[in-house]
Amino acid sequence: QIVLKVVKDINKQYSIHDFRIVTGPTHTNLIFDVLIPSNDQIKHDLLKEQINEKLQNINPNYQTVMQIEHSFV
């Protein structure tokens, strides 16, 4: 829920899928794919940075492993 809210706060048209959590002794990996509209021109590195920063503000132990995908619809 937290990751989806962060992504939707950036752009309501974005969504996530294939979400997994892997908890370790020093941090928690949040692994997921972000689906963005096919015509969206945001730079993937910038989007990853924005999402990561917002999640680390919520919990500094969160580490993100994400892929950005463009929808085909």
Residue spans for each PLM region:
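Peripheral (non-transmembrane) domains and long loops of multi-pass membrane proteins
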Residues: 1-73
